[in-house]
Amino acid sequence: MTPAFRRADLTGFLRTYGAALILLLAAMLAWQPAQAQLRVDISGTGATQYPVAIADFAVDDTHGRALAEVIRADLTRTGQFRLINAAGSGLNVDSQVAHDDWRAKGADFLAYGSITRGPDGRYDVRYRLADTVKKGQLDGVAFSGTEQELRRVAHQIADRIYEKITGVRGVFSTRIAYVLKRGSTYELQVADADGQNPQVALRSREPIISPSWSPDGSRLAYVSFESGKPVVYVHTLATSARIPVANFKGNNSAPAWSPDGSQLAVALTRDGLSQIYIVSAGGGSNMRRITRSPGIDTEPNFTPDGRSIIFTSDRSGGPQIYQTGLDGGDARRLTFNGGYNISPRISPDGSTLLYVARRDGAFRIASLNLSSGSETLLTDGRDDQSPSFAPNGMQVLYAAIQNGRSVLAGVSSDGRVRQTLSVLNGEIREPTWGPFTR
């Protein structure tokens, strides 16, 4: 949780924060729909924009139009596509595509299809993707689903279009988690990657912190406070069952999953100052200490290969980001620009470090190429927090302040395209992007 490094010195914060946790009340578990009103604002374009036309799906006009709108919205949010008007195309899945005509309209690619309702009440969706330059079909697939599942089908089609055109796997079918504050209530919510279909996993009168996805997307680890102190729980989303996995003396915080989902790296104060430990994701009293430093070590994250951990430490004075092996050997410092770098995240391919950097008095999301050492500031807000990579590494999710309120924001990994998702009846905190699940 970023505020751990935002108030006075680190040691003072832990003392203050630890005392405050005693005041926290019990949380109520729930898995139910959340009624959040959303507005998405997008700015900027990618270095490359692919011209693509998305025709309304034929036969069932109402559902076909809605299906195409979701696909268009998914592709638009990336900033990598330029939508070509396909109104009145009259295409269905069996149509012969006039490639030259669509090329003349400026479309290098054309997506089209049909949606029909079967006798069992389910909808059959068939889609095609044409390459108008090469005058051939790039993709074609059929889906089946209930009316409630059609939005998911649209995301799956958008994923296929994105991958066929860019060569990179799409993330529109993935999920995100975040904490939503409404009045005096805090909710841990899970939603589609576009912020729609939010569900409440946990509700509390007191703050919920540090949500973290399991590698298979079935569980969330987080910190909750029913026992009067911070305890790390693992929560199974399908059943709402949960178990405590770090309930040791002192503060238990900052859970992060190992790549195989069997362990969690956590920050514990059981032996004094905050240090990094590894505990079992299945619970139990066993733990293994990783760091032994005279400073405060926190915010651990496994590298994608599972062989080392990156974390934040003030061992050099101000908070910086380090890497150490699981054997707890000497830690290697990774960040040197500026005197304040926290909240590290590593890209899915292990090539790029993401973190919050204080520059000129503002807290911004930065990325560091671990090979070249080149740093890029991705955002220009005054208080940008909690960065999280998309599972394909192409986008970054974070929390930003807009008009005095905390909102969900996104930026492309090169910093060119930005989007803001405003929840009109609450404030979003600590977003985290879920993994690919299929």
Curated annotation (Swiss-Prot):
InterPro entries the record matches: 6-blade_b-propeller_TolB-like (IPR011042), PD40 (IPR011659), Tol-Pal_TolB (IPR014167), TolB_N (IPR007195)
Organism of derivation: Bordetella pertussis (strain Tohama I / ATCC BAA-589 / NCTC 13251)
Name the UniProt record assigns to this protein: Tol-Pal system protein TolB
Intracellular or extracellular location(s): Periplasm
UniProt-listed GO biological process terms: cell division; protein import
Primary location: periplasm
GO CC term (a single one): periplasmic space
Keywords of this entry: Cell cycle, Cell division, Periplasm, Signal
Pfam families given in the database record: PD40, TolB_N
Subunit structure comment from the entry: The Tol-Pal system is composed of five core proteins: the inner membrane proteins TolA, TolQ and TolR, the periplasmic protein TolB and the outer membrane protein Pal. They form a network linking the inner and outer membranes and the peptidoglycan layer.
Alphabetized NCBIfam families for the sequence: propeller_TolB (TIGR02800)
Cleavable signal peptide: 1-36
